[in-house]
Amino acid sequence: MFSAFQSSSKKLLFIAGIFLLASSQISAASPRTNYLLFCSGCHRPSGEGKHPNVPTLVAELGRMMSVPEMRQYLVRVPGAFSVPISDADLTEVINWLLIEFNSDTLPRHFEKLSVDEVSEARKNILADPLKYRELHWKSYDD
């Protein structure tokens, strides 16, 4: 009886170890993987979006980073705001897509978004993202 219990305990311990290893790999997803899982369904793997309803993430976001309110915009839009990943992971995804899809259009002295900046911005969902974008993005054109 003891050996049967010991064998069952080893099996449970082995299964628990596999589960912990698998879950740690899930939580350690790269920014690219998180982008593919949570963003590419609408914005496509290439970041091109689906005009006119889903905006592109290519080139345009780099130019937006010169306007302070637009840094928050990237975090506060419904898709980013509600994605089921941590603030730290969202920060990595946004910084990754800025560099991956926008390196040629980022401001000369671009600073990556910080986790604190993302955490704070994520507290305030945009009620009307298009209106906010029109209001603050005009400042780039001025």
Give residue ranges: language-model regions.
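Bacterial N-terminal signal peptides that target proteins for export
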Residues: 2-14
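Bacterial N-terminal signal peptides
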Residues: 11-23
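Sequence/structural segment immediately N-terminal to covalent heme-attachment motifs in c-type
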Residues: 27-48, 69
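Stable alpha-helical elements in mature extracytoplasmic
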Residues: 31, 66-73, 89-90, 114-121
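Sec/Tat-exported extracytoplasmic proteins
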Residues: 43-46, 61, 77-81, 97-101, ...
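Gly/Gly-Pro-rich "capping" loops immediately C-terminal to redox-active cysteine motifs
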Residues: 48-83
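Mature extracytoplasmic domains of secretory-pathway proteins
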Residues: 84-94
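Flexible coil segments in periplasmic/lumen-exposed cytochrome c-class electron-transfer proteins
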Residues: 88, 99-142
